[in-house]
From Swiss-Prot:
Keyword field: Cytokine, Cytoplasm, Inflammatory response, Lysosome, Mitogen, Pyrogen, Secreted
Pfam families tied to this protein: IL1 (PF00340), IL1_propep (PF02394)
UniProt miscellaneous comment: IL1B production occurs in 2 steps, each being controlled by different stimuli. First, inflammatory signals, such as LPS, stimulate the synthesis and promote the accumulation of cytosolic stores of pro-IL1B (priming). Then additional signals are required for inflammasome assembly, leading to CASP1 activation, pro-IL1B processing and eventually secretion of the active cytokine. IL1B processing and secretion are temporarily associated.
GO terms, biological process: cellular response to lipopolysaccharide; cytokine-mediated signaling pathway; fever generation; immune response; positive regulation of cell division; positive regulation of immature T cell proliferation in thymus; positive regulation of T-helper 1 cell cytokine production; positive regulation of type II interferon production
The name this protein goes by in its record: Interleukin-1 beta
Subcellular localization(s) per the UniProt record: Cytoplasm, Cytosol; Secreted; Lysosome; Secreted, Extracellular exosome
Lineage: Eukaryota, Metazoa, Chordata, Craniata, Vertebrata
Function: Potent pro-inflammatory cytokine. Initially discovered as the major endogenous pyrogen, induces prostaglandin synthesis, neutrophil influx and activation, T-cell activation and cytokine production, B-cell activation and antibody production, and fibroblast proliferation and collagen production. Promotes Th17 differentiation of T-cells. Synergizes with IL12/interleukin-12 to induce IFNG synthesis from T-helper 1 (Th1) cells. Plays a role in angiogenesis by inducing VEGF production synergistically with TNF and IL6.
Subunit structure: Monomer. In its precursor form, weakly interacts with full-length MEFV; the mature cytokine does not interact at all. Interacts with integrins ITGAV:ITGBV and ITGA5:ITGB1; integrin-binding is required for IL1B signaling. Interacts with cargo receptor TMED10; the interaction is direct and is required for the secretion of IL1B mature form. Interacts with HSP90AB1; the interaction facilitates cargo translocation into the ERGIC. Interacts with HSP90B1; the interaction facilitates cargo translocation into the ERGIC.
PROSITE patterns, per the entry: INTERLEUKIN_1
Length: 266
Protein backbone atom coordinates (compact mmCIF):
# COMPACT_ATOMS: atom_id res chain seq x y z
CA UNK A 1 0.00 0.00 0.00
CA UNK A 2 1.34 3.39 -0.91
CA UNK A 3 2.21 5.72 1.95
CA UNK A 4 1.31 9.38 2.00
CA UNK A 5 4.31 11.54 2.78
CA UNK A 6 4.16 13.77 5.81
CA UNK A 7 2.73 17.11 4.77
CA UNK A 8 5.26 19.04 6.80
CA UNK A 9 8.15 17.60 4.77
CA UNK A 10 6.51 18.45 1.46
CA UNK A 11 4.98 21.77 2.45
CA UNK A 12 5.89 24.54 0.10
CA UNK A 13 7.93 27.35 1.45
CA UNK A 14 5.93 30.50 1.35
CA UNK A 15 6.40 34.17 1.79
CA UNK A 16 3.61 36.68 2.39
CA UNK A 17 3.22 40.36 2.91
CA UNK A 18 0.37 42.85 2.60
CA UNK A 19 0.28 42.65 -1.18
CA UNK A 20 1.24 39.11 -2.19
CA UNK A 21 1.57 35.49 -1.16
CA UNK A 22 4.35 33.40 -2.80
CA UNK A 23 4.51 29.61 -2.74
CA UNK A 24 7.38 27.53 -4.08
CA UNK A 25 8.05 23.79 -4.21
CA UNK A 26 10.53 21.35 -5.74
CA UNK A 27 13.27 23.80 -6.62
CA UNK A 28 14.24 26.00 -9.55
CA UNK A 29 13.46 23.50 -12.30
CA UNK A 30 9.79 24.19 -12.07
CA UNK A 31 7.77 26.66 -14.05
CA UNK A 32 5.96 29.35 -12.06
CA UNK A 33 2.58 30.89 -12.76
CA UNK A 34 1.03 33.93 -11.09
CA UNK A 35 -2.71 34.17 -10.42
CA UNK A 36 -4.41 37.31 -9.21
CA UNK A 37 -8.13 36.99 -8.37
CA UNK A 38 -9.66 40.34 -9.16
CA UNK A 39 -12.90 39.72 -7.28
CA UNK A 40 -11.13 38.66 -4.12
CA UNK A 41 -8.77 41.56 -4.41
CA UNK A 42 -11.66 43.98 -4.22
CA UNK A 43 -12.95 42.37 -1.05
CA UNK A 44 -9.97 43.01 1.20
CA UNK A 45 -7.40 45.67 1.99
CA UNK A 46 -4.90 44.20 -0.52
CA UNK A 47 -4.82 41.92 -3.52
CA UNK A 48 -4.05 38.21 -3.13
CA UNK A 49 -1.41 36.75 -5.44
CA UNK A 50 -0.86 33.00 -5.54
CA UNK A 51 2.22 31.56 -7.26
CA UNK A 52 2.09 27.79 -7.74
CA UNK A 53 5.18 25.90 -8.86
CA UNK A 54 4.63 22.75 -10.86
CA UNK A 55 6.62 20.63 -13.28
CA UNK A 56 5.33 20.80 -16.80
CA UNK A 57 3.30 17.66 -17.64
CA UNK A 58 4.20 16.07 -14.28
CA UNK A 59 1.67 16.74 -11.50
CA UNK A 60 2.61 14.32 -8.78
CA UNK A 61 0.44 13.36 -5.85
CA UNK A 62 3.06 14.87 -3.60
CA UNK A 63 2.66 18.28 -5.21
CA UNK A 64 -1.12 18.10 -4.91
CA UNK A 65 -0.81 17.48 -1.18
CA UNK A 66 1.60 20.40 -0.93
CA UNK A 67 -0.88 22.72 -2.62
CA UNK A 68 -3.68 21.61 -0.27
CA UNK A 69 -1.52 22.22 2.79
CA UNK A 70 -0.47 25.61 1.46
CA UNK A 71 -4.07 26.62 0.82
CA UNK A 72 -4.95 25.63 4.40
CA UNK A 73 -2.12 27.84 5.59
CA UNK A 74 -3.45 30.65 3.44
CA UNK A 75 -6.99 30.18 4.77
CA UNK A 76 -5.81 30.29 8.39
CA UNK A 77 -3.31 33.09 7.94
CA UNK A 78 -3.62 36.37 9.81
CA UNK A 79 -4.47 38.13 6.57
CA UNK A 80 -7.48 35.93 5.82
CA UNK A 81 -10.44 37.99 4.68
CA UNK A 82 -13.58 38.06 6.81
CA UNK A 83 -16.65 37.35 4.70
CA UNK A 84 -19.29 40.06 5.08
CA UNK A 85 -22.87 40.53 3.87
CA UNK A 86 -21.68 42.94 1.19
CA UNK A 87 -19.43 40.23 -0.23
CA UNK A 88 -22.35 37.83 -0.54
CA UNK A 89 -24.45 40.56 -2.10
CA UNK A 90 -21.80 41.27 -4.73
CA UNK A 91 -21.53 37.56 -5.59
CA UNK A 92 -25.29 37.11 -5.86
CA UNK A 93 -25.56 40.15 -8.11
CA UNK A 94 -23.45 38.31 -10.70
CA UNK A 95 -25.53 35.13 -10.42
CA UNK A 96 -29.05 36.53 -10.33
CA UNK A 97 -30.53 39.20 -12.52
CA UNK A 98 -32.40 41.85 -10.61
CA UNK A 99 -35.88 42.54 -11.90
CA UNK A 100 -38.42 45.14 -10.76
CA UNK A 101 -41.36 43.89 -8.71
CA UNK A 102 -44.70 45.04 -10.07
CA UNK A 103 -47.65 45.18 -7.70
CA UNK A 104 -51.05 44.76 -9.26
CA UNK A 105 -54.02 46.33 -7.53
CA UNK A 106 -57.10 44.20 -7.19
CA UNK A 107 -60.63 45.38 -7.61
CA UNK A 108 -62.59 46.52 -4.60
CA UNK A 109 -64.76 43.43 -4.84
CA UNK A 110 -61.77 41.27 -3.86
CA UNK A 111 -60.35 43.73 -1.34
CA UNK A 112 -63.65 44.14 0.44
CA UNK A 113 -65.00 40.61 0.45
CA UNK A 114 -65.10 40.38 4.26
CA UNK A 115 -68.51 39.69 5.79
CA UNK A 116 -70.62 42.83 6.21
CA UNK A 117 -71.42 43.79 9.78
CA UNK A 118 -74.99 44.88 10.33
CA UNK A 119 -77.57 45.53 13.03
CA UNK A 120 -81.35 45.41 12.99
CA UNK A 121 -83.13 48.54 14.12
CA UNK A 122 -86.34 50.59 14.05
CA UNK A 123 -86.55 54.32 13.40
CA UNK A 124 -89.02 56.94 14.67
CA UNK A 125 -88.77 60.65 13.98
CA UNK A 126 -88.71 63.10 16.84
CA UNK A 127 -92.50 63.37 16.65
CA UNK A 128 -92.65 59.62 17.33
CA UNK A 129 -93.94 58.79 13.89
CA UNK A 130 -93.05 55.28 12.77
CA UNK A 131 -91.84 54.30 9.30
CA UNK A 132 -94.07 51.82 7.48
CA UNK A 133 -94.12 50.28 4.03
CA UNK A 134 -97.31 51.71 2.53
CA UNK A 135 -96.86 50.16 -0.91
CA UNK A 136 -94.19 47.92 -2.42
CA UNK A 137 -91.75 50.82 -2.89
CA UNK A 138 -93.10 53.71 -0.79
CA UNK A 139 -92.01 54.40 2.78
CA UNK A 140 -94.28 56.64 4.88
CA UNK A 141 -94.16 58.16 8.37
CA UNK A 142 -97.25 58.00 10.60
CA UNK A 143 -98.36 57.47 14.17
CA UNK A 144 -99.25 53.89 15.01
CA UNK A 145 -101.42 52.54 17.77
CA UNK A 146 -99.93 49.91 20.05
CA UNK A 147 -101.78 47.14 18.24
CA UNK A 148 -100.42 48.39 14.91
CA UNK A 149 -96.74 48.37 15.83
CA UNK A 150 -96.20 45.19 13.82
CA UNK A 151 -96.46 47.35 10.69
CA UNK A 152 -93.33 49.22 11.66
CA UNK A 153 -90.44 48.62 9.28
CA UNK A 154 -87.36 46.84 10.61
CA UNK A 155 -84.17 48.08 8.96
CA UNK A 156 -81.02 46.08 8.42
CA UNK A 157 -78.33 48.74 8.82
CA UNK A 158 -75.04 47.60 7.25
CA UNK A 159 -71.68 49.20 8.01
CA UNK A 160 -70.04 49.68 4.63
CA UNK A 161 -66.81 50.96 3.14
CA UNK A 162 -66.32 54.71 3.16
CA UNK A 163 -64.49 57.56 4.80
CA UNK A 164 -65.32 58.01 8.46
CA UNK A 165 -65.03 61.64 9.54
CA UNK A 166 -66.46 63.91 12.22
CA UNK A 167 -68.26 61.01 13.90
CA UNK A 168 -69.98 60.20 10.62
CA UNK A 169 -70.22 56.46 9.96
CA UNK A 170 -71.05 55.20 6.43
CA UNK A 171 -74.03 52.85 6.45
CA UNK A 172 -76.60 51.37 4.08
CA UNK A 173 -80.26 50.95 5.04
CA UNK A 174 -82.09 47.90 3.79
CA UNK A 175 -85.52 46.64 4.80
CA UNK A 176 -85.47 43.33 6.65
CA UNK A 177 -86.73 40.35 4.63
CA UNK A 178 -87.07 42.56 1.55
CA UNK A 179 -84.65 43.12 -1.31
CA UNK A 180 -85.14 46.88 -0.91
CA UNK A 181 -82.55 49.53 -0.02
CA UNK A 182 -82.92 53.27 0.44
CA UNK A 183 -81.03 55.02 -2.35
CA UNK A 184 -80.52 58.57 -3.58
CA UNK A 185 -81.03 59.49 -7.23
CA UNK A 186 -81.46 62.77 -9.03
CA UNK A 187 -84.76 63.48 -10.77
CA UNK A 188 -84.36 66.60 -12.82
CA UNK A 189 -82.13 68.84 -10.71
CA UNK A 190 -83.34 67.58 -7.34
CA UNK A 191 -81.91 64.63 -5.36
CA UNK A 192 -84.69 62.30 -4.27
CA UNK A 193 -85.04 59.30 -1.98
CA UNK A 194 -86.37 56.00 -3.23
CA UNK A 195 -86.59 52.31 -2.36
CA UNK A 196 -84.51 50.35 -4.86
CA UNK A 197 -84.81 46.63 -5.43
CA UNK A 198 -81.47 44.77 -5.45
CA UNK A 199 -80.12 41.30 -6.12
CA UNK A 200 -79.98 39.42 -2.78
CA UNK A 201 -77.03 37.37 -4.08
CA UNK A 202 -74.95 40.55 -4.35
CA UNK A 203 -76.27 42.83 -1.59
CA UNK A 204 -75.41 43.78 1.02
CA UNK A 205 -71.70 44.15 0.33
CA UNK A 206 -68.83 46.12 1.81
CA UNK A 207 -68.33 48.28 -1.25
CA UNK A 208 -71.81 49.66 -1.78
CA UNK A 209 -72.48 52.15 -4.56
CA UNK A 210 -72.60 55.71 -3.27
CA UNK A 211 -76.30 56.14 -3.93
CA UNK A 212 -76.96 53.57 -1.20
CA UNK A 213 -74.60 55.06 1.39
CA UNK A 214 -75.52 57.51 4.16
CA UNK A 215 -73.43 59.10 6.87
CA UNK A 216 -74.97 58.20 10.22
CA UNK A 217 -74.31 60.90 12.81
CA UNK A 218 -75.34 60.66 16.45
CA UNK A 219 -76.57 63.90 18.03
CA UNK A 220 -77.38 63.46 21.71
CA UNK A 221 -80.06 60.75 21.76
CA UNK A 222 -80.94 60.95 18.08
CA UNK A 223 -79.35 60.07 14.76
CA UNK A 224 -79.51 61.61 11.32
CA UNK A 225 -78.65 60.20 7.91
CA UNK A 226 -76.89 62.36 5.31
CA UNK A 227 -76.52 61.25 1.70
CA UNK A 228 -72.91 60.56 0.73
CA UNK A 229 -73.67 61.14 -2.94
CA UNK A 230 -75.44 64.44 -2.23
CA UNK A 231 -73.88 66.19 0.79
CA UNK A 232 -76.21 68.25 3.02
CA UNK A 233 -79.22 66.24 1.90
CA UNK A 234 -80.83 64.20 4.69
CA UNK A 235 -83.43 61.47 5.14
CA UNK A 236 -86.43 63.50 6.28
CA UNK A 237 -90.08 63.25 7.30
CA UNK A 238 -92.84 65.82 7.10
CA UNK A 239 -94.76 67.36 9.98
CA UNK A 240 -97.88 66.21 8.15
CA UNK A 241 -99.16 62.74 8.92
CA UNK A 242 -98.71 59.86 6.51
CA UNK A 243 -96.44 61.59 4.03
CA UNK A 244 -93.67 59.71 2.19
CA UNK A 245 -90.18 59.78 3.62
CA UNK A 246 -88.03 62.02 1.41
CA UNK A 247 -84.61 63.60 0.96
CA UNK A 248 -84.60 67.08 2.50
CA UNK A 249 -82.12 69.94 2.22
CA UNK A 250 -82.92 71.70 5.49
CA UNK A 251 -82.15 70.87 9.10
CA UNK A 252 -83.94 72.22 12.14
CA UNK A 253 -86.88 73.57 10.16
CA UNK A 254 -90.26 72.14 9.33
CA UNK A 255 -88.68 68.99 7.89
CA UNK A 256 -87.65 66.44 10.50
CA UNK A 257 -84.14 65.02 10.03
CA UNK A 258 -83.45 63.52 13.46
CA UNK A 259 -84.62 60.05 14.46
CA UNK A 260 -84.66 57.86 17.50
CA UNK A 261 -83.11 54.50 16.76
CA UNK A 262 -84.06 51.32 18.59
CA UNK A 263 -81.50 48.55 18.16
CA UNK A 264 -83.00 45.07 18.16
CA UNK A 265 -81.37 41.94 19.48
CA UNK A 266 -80.06 39.55 16.76
Amino acid sequence: MATVPEPINEMMAYYSDENELLFEADGPKQMKSCIQHLDLGSMGDGNIQLQISHQLYNKSFRQVVSVIVAMEKLRNSAYAHVFHDDDLRSILSFIFEEEPVIFETSSDEFLCDAPVQSVKCKLQDREQKSLVLASPCVLKALHLLSQEMSREVVFCMSFVQGEERDNKIPVALGIKDKNLYLSCVKKGDTPTLQLEEVDPKVYPKRNMEKRFVFYKTEIKNTVEFESVLYPNWYISTSQIEERPVFLGHFRGGQDITDFRMETLSP
